[in-house]
């Protein structure tokens, strides 16, 4: 965690698990003038979000930079990731809020994704998982709509066990033969049974 000299002990409460301190706007702007990395981060964040940050949003962005131990480059990757995720799901024009960016920042920080190389490795792993998820969607004939949270949870669980689309297509076939439909709990029992026997997984 980096110290900035903008606040001293007792000035603001220490941040909790999902809580950033409160800064004075003039102190943030002064830091922006002196810190080229944060100034560039602020400019790019406003460009991505399409508007000048409010005082509250400015406080959030600076809090992420000041307290979570992330480099400016890492935060830029995080912001672009949040924007790309919404764009893929809803199309152009849907942009993340600073609150959503803050939540994602805490998620990364709690997993010690603090440097650009760590962020790039994490994002590459996410891309591979999304690619696998898409293959499984097609194998289970789940096209034309988004997965529900429960469906996503099942598939992520199976992928984490080492089962890809090819193996899950077999489980899907057996599920439909046994139940006449895609019964998630039934298919889950099949996959877990395989896992216990170390069958079909990678």
Please tell me what each predicted stretch does.
Residues 3-202:
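Electrostatic interaction modules used in gene-expression and signaling proteins
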